Swiss-Prot record:
GO MF annotations, alphabetized: D-amino-acid dehydrogenase activity
EC numbers for this chain: 1.4.99.-
Similarity comment: family membership: Belongs to the DadA oxidoreductase family.
SUPFAM superfamilies in the cross-refs: FAD-linked reductases, C-terminal domain (SSF54373), FAD/NAD(P)-binding domain (SSF51905)
Cofactor: FAD
GO biological process terms, semicolon-separated: D-alanine catabolic process
Domain of life: Bacteria
Protein name (Swiss-Prot/TrEMBL): D-amino acid dehydrogenase
Lineage of source species: Bacteria, Pseudomonadati, Pseudomonadota, Betaproteobacteria, Neisseriales
Organism in which the protein naturally occurs: Neisseria meningitidis serogroup A / serotype 4A (strain DSM 15465 / Z2491)
Length: 418
């Protein structure tokens, strides 16, 4: 079967890999000049299988209001002039109940745990190097009230069988030795040993090469201009320079899935939530992080690659425009310099921003649509890297008409159309 994948980020390229593995003739198109040029370019680098949590949770509306008034807020809201922004926020608020949280949490954990297994199989199969580490995530709390608040999160971890260890301030240095220098700034910690790290862009670039070896064709600089359909079947996808036909189409366009599929009257509840990152060279390995450190106060993650440190975080709801405000850079620099002052060189940084495709319930959109041959693999929010291989394998199985290894019916767009 001929399959056309829209999007060459980690979701699209991973989908192409599993579709090719299943024996399909696969073509991938993207508007960028290469793979992983947008949301997958410089994300935080966490493979946070264990700490998969919906944004929409009880108490979040109150917390969000408090965050907005911080000098270095983890959440920023700027009206983008659209009614849709308000509609999306209202939808998200409907999921901030204990009942909805449990439903969404179960879906996310199921997807993340499946992705963990897919990464295990993939690495065993390919031996790919993407600067990955399997040394867990260390969440640190700067205030006693944060330690107390974490008890609710720990109860969720226990409910879903996620391994963890609560830490006293001095115990945090067992996992991140460089933090011994700043123990006085830490009130406690939580270690998730099953989490991992890796460079999403490097992974996607390497997977692109493996896909080519399997015969997958890539067409870059292809901006989609039109999608033609006959009844409930997609016929062609047209770009400014080409026309593509396929038996099946997989949409993995991240935030732009919504705008592109609006052409065929599909209403995808995806909003672009902006995140920021800094990448800096390691100057002193002993003073740098070993894996990922998540600063609960600032909602910033600090991740170690081989010779680089990636600092990522924040959530900004302000539309599709990509800007790089110096204030956001200052927040990221403040956190990494406060915890790892001797680890990296802040005079040599790459400052980046990307758009996360977020759904109101924080769960991705995977599977069938009302069109017989149009499938989704999008809407992963902050967990696109974590869920990448699991989502892609699930998508490939659905496209192929195979039984999936995990439940997938409640991940489709239909949950928003009931």
């Amino acid at each position: 079967m001929k399959v056309l994948v829209l999007g060459a980020g980690v979701a699209g390229v991973s989908s192409a890999w599993y579709l090719a593995e299943a024996g399909h003739e696969v073509t991938v198109i993207d508007r960028a000049e290469g793979v992983a040029m947008e949301t997958s370019f410089a994300n935080a680098g966490q493979l946070s299988y264990g700490y998969t949590t919906p944004w929409a949770a009880p108490g979040i509306p109150t917390k969000a209001l408090k965050w907005l008034f911080k000098s270095h807020p983890p959440l920023l809201f700027r009206p983008d002039g659209s009614l849709y922004q308000i509609e999306w926020l209202w939808q998200m608020l409907q999921h901030c109940t204990a009942a909805r949280y449990q439903i969404n949490k179960e879906r996310m954990v199921r997807m993340s745990e499946y992705s963990r297994e897919m990464f295990r199989r993939f690495e065993a199969q390919t031996g790919m190097n993407f600067e990955g580490r399997k040394k867990g995530t260390l969440q640190i709390f700067r205030q006693t009230k944060e330690v107390e608040a974490a008890k609710q999160d720990i109860a969720v971890l226990e409910r879903y069988g996620v391994p963890y260890r609560r830490l006293k301030p001095e115990e945090c240095a067992e996992f991140e030795p460089a933090l011994a220098r700043v123990t006085a700034k830490i009130a406690g910690g939580l270690h998730l040993p099953a989490d991992a790290t890796g460079d999403c862009r490097l992974f996607t670039e390497n997977l692109y090469k493996l896909c080519q070896e399997k015969g997958v064709r890539f067409h870059f600089n292809q901006t989609i201009s039109r999608i033609d359909h006959n009844g409930l079947r997609i016929k062609t996808v047209e770009t400014e320079t080409g026309r593509f036909e396929a038996d099946a189409v997989v949409c993995a366009l991240g935030c732009f899935s919504r705008t592109v599929l609006a052409q065929v009257d599909l209403n995808l509840p995806i909003y672009p939530v902006k995140g920021y990152s800094l990448t800096l060279p390691v100057t002193n390995s002993d003073g740098a992080p070993v894996s990922t450190v998540l600063d609960e106060s600032y909602k910033v993650a600090i991740t170690r690659f081989n010779n680089r440190i990636r600092v990522g975080g924040m959530a900004e709801l302000s539309g599709y425009a990509i800007k790089l405000p110096e204030k956001r850079r200052e927040t990221l620099a403040l956190v990494v310099n406060d915890l790892f002052p001797e680890g990296g060189d802040l005079n040599q940084t790459l400052f980046w921003s990307g758009l996360r495709p977020m759904t109101p319930d924080s769960t991705p959109l995977i599977g069938r649509t009302r069109f017989d041959n149009l499938f989704l693999n999008t809407g992963h929010g902050t967990l696109g890297w974590t869920m990448s291989l699991g989502s892609a394998k699930l998508t490939a199985d659905i496209v192929s008409g195979k039984d999936t290894e995990i439940r997938s019916d409640d991940l489709s767009l239909s949950r928003y159309q009931a």
